[in-house]
Amino acid sequence: MAASVSLNKDFALELIETNLAVVRKDIRRILSRWQVKSSQEMIEMTEKGELREAEVDALALTNLIDKEKELEGLHAFVDEA
């Protein structure tokens, strides 16, 4: 049985934007820790073994990127509603 919830559009957008800000801050923190400029660069360097012991952060980064894309899609959906 599915439940539905009514939510103010502006409030929903604010929640999504706040979550996006947290995700992006976490992405920047990981990139800064490894002194790389982009997520793609870090993932590639980790796969090549150029960043030793970065596997856990690279996996977290991949998950954060997925979450960022999901939130961006949700933001666009809610914004267009």
Specify the residue positions occupied by each region the protein language model found.
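Short, charge-rich amphipathic alpha-helices with coiled-coil/heptad character
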Residues: 1-11, 46
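Amphipathic alpha-helical coiled-coil segments
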Residues: 9, 13-23, 27-30, 61-64, ...
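Residue-level signal for short amphipathic helical patches enriched in basic/charged
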Residues: 18, 37, 78
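Short E/K-rich amphipathic alpha-helical oligomerization segments
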Residues: 29-51
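Short, charge-rich amphipathic interface segments used for partner binding and complex assembly
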Residues: 44-67
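Long amphipathic alpha-helical coiled-coil segments
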Residues: 70-81
